Amino acid sequence: MMAPRIGVFVCRCGINIAAYVDVPAVVEYAKTLPGVEYAEENMYTCSSDGLNKIKEAIKKHSLERVVVASCTPRTHEPLFQVTCEEAGVNKYLFEMANIRDQCSWVHMREPEKATEKAKDLIRMAVAKAALLEPGDEPEIDVNPSALVIGGGVSGMRAALSIADQGFDVTIVEKEHNLGGKLLGFDSLFPHKQKASEVLEPLIKRVTTHPRIRVLTESVVKSVYGFIGNFDIGINAGGKAENFNVGTIIVAVGAEVLEPRGLYLYGEDPRVVTQSELEQLLHAGRVAAGRIVMIQCAGSRSVERPYCSRICCNEAVKNAINVAEKGREVYVLYRDLQTYGIHYSRLEQEAKRKGVKFLKYQAEKPPLVTASPDGLKVSLYSPTVNEAVELRADMLILSTPLIPVADAKELSQMLKVPLDSNGFFMEAHVKLRPIDFATDGIFVCGTAHSPKGIGESVAQALGVASRASIPMAKKRVRTAAIMSQVDQTRCSGCGTCIDVCPYNAIRKNEKGLAETIAAVCKGCGVCGATCPEKAITMHHFTDEQIQAQGLAALEEG
């Protein structure tokens, strides 16, 4: 069998690579490697000109494998794979060597070592490329319907957007009513619109839409399957129900921290949260006299290091509403996070209406004590550079949004991750900001992280668009990088099933393991743990990895 003809394309990436790696020397070295028929350098291999040069070289030199030495495959591999296919080379006969992130950027002060390392990485990539095999991507049918878990604003907007495109949607909401946390708001920032003016028309559209089915007082109990074919089990008002959908959207929202034990909350009825103040404002029951608000009550701490993002805006909005009722208002803050032009204007409006802002230091938080004639708030404020004592008739705590109580249970059911704070975590913050690593499942709203209504709705429309793509196509192609079980060697021990994080392996009628192609992500955990060596990882076979390892040990 003749060795495949390999082409190597080394990218200068402007100065990102060329300033630290001797690219011409690397190209000349690549030409000496076994199987390499052609090698060249490009200023930007990912540019239209660079891609056209790859296609021209494939045709002119009858190349059968392609290696690009440039930046990260995470961002650019799909682009180069498409280029290879356009020139008649199977996309799985392509290999990348990351000589930017893993070489030039690491060794900016060592150009000679950077050049030698670039040669090593290319030698390894060429060794693997020589053993690559074409891959076929299986297609699977997609059920053109969606499940939205959560009936808050983001869940309802996502459901409406999908339903308006002609797809059936089921909303599963655990509470008695749709609306989520917005039900507890009196008005919305930054335009002080009544929450009911937003919520009531939205709920009416959802409940009367012919394509949307709403199940309240319902929870998801089981999820099995893969993109295009998820089997859902729910408990709907005490009754079990099962149905099938093609995509899933997680929009379970978040909860507001109940800060018991913090600043006398739960001990003195004059201490309430911003959410509780909203309800008092709606009922017209705000105490007369002086109102003091404390920001970051329970957030930006060791236990919850994140900023909840909406707290400052909510506090400023409520401070304005309280000031308009003739109350004196103080806002005690660490850093006032009224981001964006509208919220900044809201802050300026609050100052014009007499709201006073005093900064406090994180290491010296306010001290609150109670007496029959009022609350006393003591702090050192760098704003006035002295200790301050305020008598308060009412103390308002700005508490953060926290993950819902059943987030962990749902994440395990869906096989999707949570971040260190307990919120649902996207596949990639820049490249796939609303997708999970598990295909066909998406996240939006405060289930993902604390955010305002505008951002939640933007994410909801984004996930609706993403979820609609496979449903509109009716079929999806899965990657050929997956595991394959040699059932003549499989002992049926089930170790691979136990370790697979995606539930992508099951036992067949003979009790032997088999891969579910649509679910497998090619992570390789099963292949690494199989005691019988019965599992092959396509595109990352033992032979290919060993060839790379041996190439790494060769002298450049």
Residue ranges and their predicted role:
Residues 2-6, 183-208, 212, 236, ...:
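Flanking helices and flexible, charged tails adjoining ferredoxin-like Fe-S electron-transfer domains
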Residues 10-20, 115, 119, 148-163, ...:
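Cysteine-centered iron-sulfur cluster-binding motifs in ferredoxin-type domains/subunits
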Residues 2-6, 152-155, 334-373, 450, ...:
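Mid-to-C-terminal Rossmann-like scaffold of FAD/NAD(P)H-dependent oxidoreductases
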Residues 49, 59-61, 104-109, 114-122, ...:
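Rossmann-like dinucleotide/flavin-binding elements
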Residues 193, 199-255, 320-406, 507-508:
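A Rossmann-like FAD-binding core segment of flavoenzymes
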